[in-house]
């Protein structure tokens, strides 16, 4: 005879469960759709410029979302080697933002995710937006290392 056994756990393992309103975060009192999880970046004090360039190149290529990988890896290939220390810092801060936010800001999808003031006039974002327009109409791929 076959018996159905329901598993129960003493803790909640998932933040999102099919978008139901019953999924309340007991800590914040919000539904799963309203929960903001912000992981602060690791502070990197005294990082050498070449080490920072290598890290930023890696972080530009390995984002996890193909669209953002393509944009940022092309940007890094074109501009990273000539960036000043201040531009590297600004680009580093941009890479701390969520992938989809960067993609929407770069492609000017303000109806989905408006670009915040801190990035709207940024030289880094301006170059990224220019690159995202793909005026040459070329087929994009990950640049070689």
Swiss-Prot record:
Stored HAMAP family: SDHAF2
What family does this chain come from, according to its entry?
Belongs to the SDHAF2 family.
What is the official name of this protein in its record?
A: Succinate dehydrogenase assembly factor 2, mitochondrial
- Subcellular location(s) per record: Mitochondrion matrix
More details: This protein may be expected to contain an N-terminal transit peptide but none has been predicted.
Subunit structure, interactors included: Interacts with the flavoprotein subunit within the SDH catalytic dimer.
Regions that span the bilayer: none
Q: Which Pfam families match?
A: Sdh5
Q: Which InterPro entries match?
A: SDH (IPR005631), SDH_sf (IPR036714), SDHAF2 (IPR028882)
Function recorded in the entry? Plays an essential role in the assembly of succinate dehydrogenase (SDH), an enzyme complex (also referred to as respiratory complex II) that is a component of both the tricarboxylic acid (TCA) cycle and the mitochondrial electron transport chain, and which couples the oxidation of succinate to fumarate with the reduction of ubiquinone (coenzyme Q) to ubiquinol. Required for flavinylation (covalent attachment of FAD) of the flavoprotein subunit of the SDH catalytic dimer.
Record keyword Endoplasmic reticulum present: no
Q: Which UniProt keywords apply?
A: Chaperone, Mitochondrion
Write out the GO cellular component annotations. mitochondrial matrix; mitochondrion
Domain of life, per the record?
Answer: Eukaryota
Q: Which SUPFAM superfamilies match?
A: YgfY-like
Origin organism is Yarrowia lipolytica (strain CLIB 122 / E 150) (Yeast)
| Biological process per Gene Ontology, one example term | mitochondrial electron transport, succinate to ubiquinone
* Organism ancestry: Eukaryota, Fungi, Dikarya, Ascomycota, Saccharomycotina
